Amino acid sequence: MKKLILVIVVLLMIAACGQSYEETKRITREQRREAMRKDSAALKVAVMPTLDCLPLYVAQYYQLFDTLNGGVRLKFYNAQMDCDTAILRGRVEGVITDLVRAKRMEKQGLKMRYVAATNAYWQLVTNRNARIRQLRQLDDKMVAMTRFSATDLLTDRARDSVKLAPNQVFKVQINDLNVRVQMLQNNEIDALWLPEPQATQARLMKNPVIMDSRSVKLQLGVLAFREQEMRRQARGKQLALFTQAYNQSCDSISKYGIAYYRDLLIEHCKVKSQLIDSIPQDIRYAHAHGPRQQDVAYVEQWLQKIDTLKTNARNGNK
């Protein structure tokens, strides 16, 4: 009798475990579907550990995006090319990028809606041990940049300004900003383009700056969204509310200063507190408005030149 009772108890336990396991699987599937639904409804924006993304970090922290149906989700990347891949493949609806990359993606068939021209700028920093103090000294030197981006265009601008031939300056594609900084620290690169706050980090290490994108009057930073997605009524409403929150953040940063948001920069840009005090505090954040036509024209002209050179090179090899 005791054995029979024991068998019954064991069978009941097995049945209970089986039900528990199946129930757990069902709940997990439901949770996964719910997470996917929420992610799909949210407005997703690809961002980087750079200062031009600060308005989005501020808006997220102070819950300015909470009025959006579905909310906003920031997707973090360390390389501009990874951000652009995310929007090309539909993983995000928006991206903080540069005008060259955005126009390049449009040439590849992705229509973009330009919501804001950001205050992004890039500095050409040289390795202090390379003793490069002028642009003409880039002859036979390696410059870290990203192909078909603002830094690619700016490298050409720097090279052409001192009449160096294309084969005299070696462009090295290093997409990850952290890797660029590490290469500078390890004396593995002669020169490199850096945005803020990475440029400040390089300057604090006593590395010279020989060119600044602001000195050539180019404003190349942009916040752009997938045009086709934004034509949907629900997305259009989200974008309008997103823009309001973005403008509020810009006003707040301009009022209180960059250093006021020290904790956000430490968290998202992975920099030390002392570095933030060395970032130029006169940087301003403007309300959302599209890029200037003069910048668009310059970028399109440069991209056309690159395409022509590639076509001529292919024809010459035939």
Task: Report the location of each language-model feature.
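Ligand-binding clefts/hinges and TM-proximal coupling segments of bilobed small-molecule sensing domains
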Residues: 19-26, 149-170, 241-279
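Second-shell loop/turn segments in exported
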Residues: 43-44, 142-145, 228-232, 247-254, ...
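Extracytoplasmic/secreted envelope proteins and their assembly/folding machinery
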Residues: 53-57, 84, 99-102, 152, ...
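Sec-dependent signal peptide recognition
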Residues: 2-7
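Pocket-lining segment of extracytoplasmic ligand-binding domains
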Residues: 99-100, 168-265
